[in-house]
């Protein structure tokens, strides 16, 4: 990783190489990797690198101050642990501080019984946020001397600085989240805690020995200060001075109440009972009130290093750790809060040594999750740089591992200090008050969705039910208000729905043409070729470009639909046609085609105000009713008795007149009389 000069790129590369979880495919800052030279991303990287350089310098100054101010000797008893003699304790902790650059042979990874008890600290103050961020993420099998603050571990760190990360095969290995948790237990209040050994303060800057399978730290010359320049926790929005002051004040307030305790030695799970340092969960620091915790230890613990600054840990080969014991915990569900900048790294959940955690915590807990190499892998929070600022509850499954590490004895060798415990301890973890960082701007999709939602709400509020006209026949949505209602061809439309099928212009209040189920404006209908599908007049044969009149299944121009006799327009007037499809008005039709009376020779027309024609048919002739009478006496003839018709030589007579006419004639003609 020496080819990267920019710390931002170094951190991004390191995140991708972590085998604890899958790195974000969009990169560290929620930016598409294929986007190229994004000016916003370049500016963010520049600011990030500048802040990290400042944190390096402040960290060195604080470490030098810690080495000068913290005494080496006064240590309190371990909470719940056994006591050793002063000579043994100085061999464990004090002797490691006198060695300068001496490299000890690596120790084999320890294995522990599954029934071991977890050592929990009672009041160990944590590191400030700057120190916690300066600690590197370590996972994989660790080998090396148990050095708490000396420069012994730098030799091993420099040798393994360029090794690629490998899978964690040892259950006692640390995840980067565990490393943060342990770090929060070792920061004393500067100048106010004489009982804390320099080994605790120096554990921040010391190079932790790592095997070739561990994550690569940055190399540093042996002559330099033990503080390694490995800023891999991304915390660009945090002010180092403010965070340090807040942490120190919180530690000083509790220094008189609780003695300094041990770290929790549950393999890769480190729990801080004192004031917490910022934990990084799901890409965001958890924010909440700071509360002290009082962990309950299930059984007395036999520890090889009873000093308060001993910092017992169960991992073999981690600098600054002494003896520790293991236990199997049942991890209760913990609240996981997401807040602050999205560039933080989520802590991987520990799984090798279980520890019972109280589920009713009032703050956020350090990252807990599955760890490679364990038998039972649980699911834990992943890296989530794009997560929103909302609290999220994450239920952690019960994590277990087959093996637990042995504790370290005072002479640096493995000691069998495992104890059985009938129950798992429970620890309350506090909230971490952090300064929230800059929010990421919402994406374009989120902005569009918000705009659509607001538009729908405004439309629902703006249209009362009283203005509802009905449903649009085109979009099937309700039509509210006269301003958007449009009625055409007996149907209801939105004015935005009733548009030209060719140019999509609104047709409300304009001339339109309905052709084959579509409506067109006049311009598109006349000049775009749509007139080829228009109807033609049955009489003149021309295209009907204006109003159309349909009659008898045929289409006509209104001006062409006229009576052939009087030439009057028959639009809206009763009409009829003859066998030759000639159009007549009713009056002219009867005049031309009505039957004529055989008596008077006039056409038999229907009476005024009626369409029915009344006529009398006699001797295959048509007569008006008033023309059907006796020619001699004028008697009206009909079918009644005494009024019957007796024709004679095509003349109409009643019976008496008919007899008279016959008497005047010769008798020969009487044989040919007819009665009608």
Curated annotation (Swiss-Prot):
<dbReference type="GO" id="GO:0035278">
    <property type="term" value="P:miRNA-mediated gene silencing by inhibition of translation"/>
</dbReference>
<keyword id="KW-0539">Nucleus</keyword>
<dbReference type="GO" id="GO:0035331">
    <property type="term" value="P:negative regulation of hippo signaling"/>
</dbReference>
<dbReference type="GO" id="GO:0005886">
    <property type="term" value="C:plasma membrane"/>
</dbReference>
<dbReference type="Pfam" id="PF00412">
    <property type="entry name" value="LIM"/>
</dbReference>
<dbReference type="InterPro" id="IPR047245">
    <property type="entry name" value="Ajuba-like_LIM1"/>
</dbReference>
<keyword id="KW-0597">Phosphoprotein</keyword>
<feature type="modified residue" description="Phosphoserine">
    <location>
        <position position="233"/>
    </location>
</feature>
<keyword id="KW-0943">RNA-mediated gene silencing</keyword>
<keyword id="KW-0677">Repeat</keyword>
<feature type="region of interest" description="Interaction with RB1">
    <location>
        <begin position="404"/>
        <end position="442"/>
    </location>
</feature>
<feature type="region of interest" description="Disordered">
    <location>
        <begin position="189"/>
        <end position="389"/>
    </location>
</feature>
<dbReference type="GO" id="GO:0090090">
    <property type="term" value="P:negative regulation of canonical Wnt signaling pathway"/>
</dbReference>
<dbReference type="GO" id="GO:0033962">
    <property type="term" value="P:P-body assembly"/>
</dbReference>
<feature type="compositionally biased region" description="Gly residues">
    <location>
        <begin position="243"/>
        <end position="253"/>
    </location>
</feature>
<dbReference type="GO" id="GO:0005654">
    <property type="term" value="C:nucleoplasm"/>
</dbReference>
<dbReference type="GO" id="GO:0005667">
    <property type="term" value="C:transcription regulator complex"/>
</dbReference>
<dbReference type="GO" id="GO:0005912">
    <property type="term" value="C:adherens junction"/>
</dbReference>
<dbReference type="GO" id="GO:0000932">
    <property type="term" value="C:P-body"/>
</dbReference>
<dbReference type="GO" id="GO:0016442">
    <property type="term" value="C:RISC complex"/>
</dbReference>
<dbReference type="GO" id="GO:0002076">
    <property type="term" value="P:osteoblast development"/>
</dbReference>
<dbReference type="GO" id="GO:0016310">
    <property type="term" value="P:phosphorylation"/>
</dbReference>
<dbReference type="GO" id="GO:0016477">
    <property type="term" value="P:cell migration"/>
</dbReference>
<feature type="compositionally biased region" description="Low complexity">
    <location>
        <begin position="232"/>
        <end position="242"/>
    </location>
</feature>
<feature type="modified residue" description="Phosphoserine">
    <location>
        <position position="316"/>
    </location>
</feature>
<keyword id="KW-0965">Cell junction</keyword>
<feature type="modified residue" description="Phosphoserine">
    <location>
        <position position="239"/>
    </location>
</feature>
<dbReference type="GO" id="GO:0006355">
    <property type="term" value="P:regulation of DNA-templated transcription"/>
</dbReference>
<feature type="modified residue" description="Phosphoserine">
    <location>
        <position position="145"/>
    </location>
</feature>
<dbReference type="GO" id="GO:0005737">
    <property type="term" value="C:cytoplasm"/>
</dbReference>
<comment type="subunit">
    <text>Interacts (via LIM domains) with TRAF6. Found in a complex with TRAF6, PRKCZ and SQSTM1. Interacts (via LIM domains) SNAI2/SLUG (via SNAG domain) and SCRT1 (via SNAG domain). Interacts with SQSTM1 and RB1. Found in a complex composed of LIMD1, VHL, EGLN1/PHD2, ELOB and CUL2. Interacts with EIF4E, AGO1, AGO2, DCP2, DDX6, LATS1, LATS2, EGLN1/PHD2, EGLN2/PHD1 and EGLN3/PHD3. Interacts (via LIM zinc-binding 2) with isoform 1 and isoform 3 of VHL. Interacts (via LIM domains) with SNAI1 (via SNAG domain).</text>
</comment>
<feature type="modified residue" description="Phosphoserine">
    <location>
        <position position="272"/>
    </location>
</feature>
<feature type="domain" description="LIM zinc-binding 2">
    <location>
        <begin position="535"/>
        <end position="595"/>
    </location>
</feature>
<keyword id="KW-0805">Transcription regulation</keyword>
<dbReference type="GO" id="GO:0045892">
    <property type="term" value="P:negative regulation of DNA-templated transcription"/>
</dbReference>
<dbReference type="GO" id="GO:0008360">
    <property type="term" value="P:regulation of cell shape"/>
</dbReference>
<feature type="region of interest" description="Necessary for nuclear localization">
    <location>
        <begin position="472"/>
        <end position="676"/>
    </location>
</feature>
<dbReference type="GO" id="GO:0035195">
    <property type="term" value="P:miRNA-mediated post-transcriptional gene silencing"/>
</dbReference>
<dbReference type="InterPro" id="IPR001781">
    <property type="entry name" value="Znf_LIM"/>
</dbReference>
<feature type="domain" description="LIM zinc-binding 3">
    <location>
        <begin position="595"/>
        <end position="664"/>
    </location>
</feature>
<dbReference type="GO" id="GO:0005829">
    <property type="term" value="C:cytosol"/>
</dbReference>
<feature type="compositionally biased region" description="Low complexity">
    <location>
        <begin position="201"/>
        <end position="213"/>
    </location>
</feature>
């Amino acid at each position: 990783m020496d080819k990267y000069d920019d710390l931002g790129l170094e951190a991004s590369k390191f995140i991708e190489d972590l085998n604890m979880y899958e790195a974000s495919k969009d990169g560290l800052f929620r930016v598409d990797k294929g986007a190229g030279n994004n000016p916003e991303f370049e500016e963010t990287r520049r600011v990030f690198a500048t802040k990290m350089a400042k944190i390096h310098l402040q960290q060195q100054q604080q470490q030098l101050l810690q080495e000068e101010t913290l005494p080496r000797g006064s240590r309190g008893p371990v909470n719940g642990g056994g006591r050793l003699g002063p000579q043994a304790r100085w061999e464990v902790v004090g002797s490691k501080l006198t060695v300068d650059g001496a490299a000890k042979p690596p120790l084999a990874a320890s294995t522990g019984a599954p029934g071991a008890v977890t050592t929990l600290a009672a009041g160990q103050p944590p590191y400030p946020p700057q120190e916690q961020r300066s600690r590197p993420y370590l996972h994989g099998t660790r080998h090396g001397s148990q050095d708490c603050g000396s420069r012994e571990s730098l030799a091993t760190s420099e040798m393994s600085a360029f090794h690629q990360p490998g899978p964690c095969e040892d259950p006692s290995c640390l995840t980067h989240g565990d490393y943060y948790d342990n770090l929060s237990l070792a920061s004393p209040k500067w100048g106010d805690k004489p009982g804390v050994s320099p080994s605790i303060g120096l554990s921040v800057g010391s190079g932790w020995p790592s095997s070739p399978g561990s994550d690569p730290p940055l190399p540093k010359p042996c002559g330099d200060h033990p503080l390694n320049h490995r800023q891999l926790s991304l915390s660009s929005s945090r002010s180092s001075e403010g965070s340090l002051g807040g942490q120190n004040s919180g530690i000083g307030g509790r220094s008189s109440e609780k003695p300094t305790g041990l770290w929790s030695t549950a393999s890769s799970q480190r729990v801080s009972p004192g004031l917490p340092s910022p934990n990084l969960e799901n890409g965001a620091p958890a924010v909440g009130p700071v509360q002290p915790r009082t962990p309950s230890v299930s059984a007395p613990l036999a520890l090889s290093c009873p000093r308060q600054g001993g910092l017992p840990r169960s991992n073999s080969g981690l600098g600054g750790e002494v003896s520790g014991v293991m236990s199997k915990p049942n991890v209760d569900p913990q609240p996981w809060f997401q807040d602050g900048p999205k560039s933080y790294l989520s802590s991987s959940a520990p799984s090798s040594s279980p520890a019972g955690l109280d589920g009713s915590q009032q703050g956020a807990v350090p990252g807990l999750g599955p760890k490679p190499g364990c038998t039972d892998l649980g699911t834990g929070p992943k890296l989530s740089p794009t997560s929103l600022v909302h609290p999220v509850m994450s239920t952690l499954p019960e994590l277990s591992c087959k093996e637990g590490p042995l504790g370290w004895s005072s002479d640096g060798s493995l000691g069998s200090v495992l104890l059985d415990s009938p129950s798992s301890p429970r620890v309350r973890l506090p909230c971490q008050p952090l300064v929230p960082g800059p929010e990421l701007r919402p994406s374009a999709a989120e902005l569009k969705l918000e705009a659509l939602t607001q538009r729908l709400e405004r439309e629902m509020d703006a249209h009362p039910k009283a203005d509802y006209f009905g449903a649009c026949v085109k979009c099937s949505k309700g039509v509210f208000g006269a301003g958007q209602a449009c009625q055409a061809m007996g149907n209801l439309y939105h004015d935005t729905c009733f548009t030209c099928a060719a140019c999509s212009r609104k047709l409300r209040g304009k001339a339109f043409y309905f052709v084959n189920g579509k409506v067109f404006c006049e311009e598109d209908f006349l000049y775009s070729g749509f007139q080829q599908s228009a109807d033609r007049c049955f009489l003149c044969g021309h295209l009907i470009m204006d109003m159309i009149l349909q009659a008898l299944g045929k289409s006509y121009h209104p001006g062409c639909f006229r009576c052939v006799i009087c030439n009057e327009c028959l639009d809206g007037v009763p009409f009829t046609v003859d066998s030759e499809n000639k159009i007549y008005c009713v009056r002219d039709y009867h005049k031309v085609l009505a039957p004529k009376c055989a008596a008077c020779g006039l056409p038999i027309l229907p009476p005024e105000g009626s369409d029915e024609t009344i006529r009398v048919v006699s001797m295959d002739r048509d007569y008006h009713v008033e023309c059907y009478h006796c020619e001699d006496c004028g008697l009206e003839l009909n079918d009644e008795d005494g009024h019957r018709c007796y024709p004679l030589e095509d003349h109409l007579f009643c019976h008496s007149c008919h007899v008279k006419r016959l008497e005047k004639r010769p008798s020969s003609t009487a044989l040919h009389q007819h009665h009608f």
